[in-house]
Amino acid sequence: MKLNDLRDKDGATHSKKRLGRGIGSGSGKTAGRGVKGQKARSGVAINGFEGGQMPLYRRLPKRGFNNIFAKSFVVVSLARIQEAVDAKKLDAKATVTAEALVAAGVIRRVKDGVRVLSDGELKAKLAFDVAGASKAAIEKIEKAGGSVKLPEKAAAE
């Protein structure tokens, strides 16, 4: 067998239907599009329109709202911070702040602050000055000999 002998098995492929090539073909003239009207024309797709039937987005009830005061925190795990310390990207003696994490490449941008979560283990003794931290994360940080400074309101979380 040679490369030029290779071909698909019989019946594996179908030749495409050639539309609009005379009425004898069975799909000539209107080419399977019916008669006139918007859908017979080219370039038609009305998103969300279901032919007059009440569309799905109107059948479902409205729910919820967007809180304009919602804070969006960047989430960082303890494991990710420990990796940065091990790789010497984050100074273990300096305070860990949002700006320090951006400079170390741990996070890309600070939205409304950084929230530390307890994923992974923390071996380094670090001082944190962040917008938020989970209770478990605070426990792990203090167990490693570090400290956490939170804003007044976030401390009640």
From Swiss-Prot:
The keyword Protease does not apply. GO terms for cellular component: cytosolic large ribosomal subunit. It comes from the Bacteria. Residues 21-35 have a biased composition (Gly residues). Residues 1-39 are annotated as: Disordered. Residues 1-13 have a biased composition (Basic and acidic residues). GO terms for biological process: translation. PROSITE patterns: RIBOSOMAL_L15. Keywords: Ribonucleoprotein, Ribosomal protein, RNA-binding, rRNA-binding. GO terms for molecular function: rRNA binding; structural constituent of ribosome. InterPro entries: Ribosomal_uL15, Ribosomal_uL15/eL18, Ribosomal_uL15/eL18_sf, Ribosomal_uL15_bac-type, Ribosomal_uL15_CS. Binds to the 23S rRNA. PANTHER family: 50S RIBOSOMAL PROTEIN L15, LARGE RIBOSOMAL SUBUNIT PROTEIN UL15M. HAMAP family: Ribosomal_uL15. Belongs to the universal ribosomal protein uL15 family. Part of the 50S ribosomal subunit. This is Large ribosomal subunit protein uL15. It comes from Mesorhizobium japonicum (strain LMG 29417 / CECT 9101 / MAFF 303099) (Mesorhizobium loti (strain MAFF 303099)).
